[in-house]
Structure formats: structure tokens, C-alpha cells
């Protein structure tokens, strides 16, 4: 198991997931729809398919759209 922190813009979650889980798995585990956020780690944007292999803290940026 690994610890994943998801923080930013009103979110502050800390969860445990199996090693090899994806960014999308982490978002799903806390009920955040992947299309509503951009996820980054150390100022690098991560695709939702990124595999997580150890404890990590992820920064969330809310995506807004409209006209």
C-alpha cells in the first residue's frame, strides 16, 4: 500500500491505494471526477493514466469551462 495526498482548491484528502494504482484511481477513490481537475506533482502535470509507485502528494487545480 502507498499513501496518496490530494490537495488544492478546497480539497485535502489523504488515502491509501495499492502500489501501481493510477492518478485516476486516486481521484475516483475520493469522488473527484477526473474531467474537473488537472493533477500535478512538483510542478509537472500528470496524465490521469500515470501509474503511482509510492507515497506521493498531488496538487489539484480546478478546471472551469463555459462561455
Residue ranges of model-derived segments:
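Ubiquitin-like/PB1-type beta-grasp interaction modules and other compact soluble beta-rich domains
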Residues: 1-66
Amino acid at each position: 500500500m502507498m499513501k496518496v495526498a490530494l490537495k488544492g482548491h478546497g480539497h485535502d484528502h489523504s488515502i491509501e491505494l495499492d502500489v501501481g494504482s493510477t492518478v485516476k484511481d486516486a481521484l475516483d477513490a475520493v469522488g473527484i471526477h477526473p474531467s474537473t481537475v488537472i493533477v500535478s506533482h512538483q510542478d509537472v502535470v500528470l496524465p490521469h493514466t500515470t501509474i503511482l509507485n509510492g507515497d506521493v502528494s498531488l496538487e489539484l487545480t480546478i478546471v472551469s469551462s463555459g462561455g
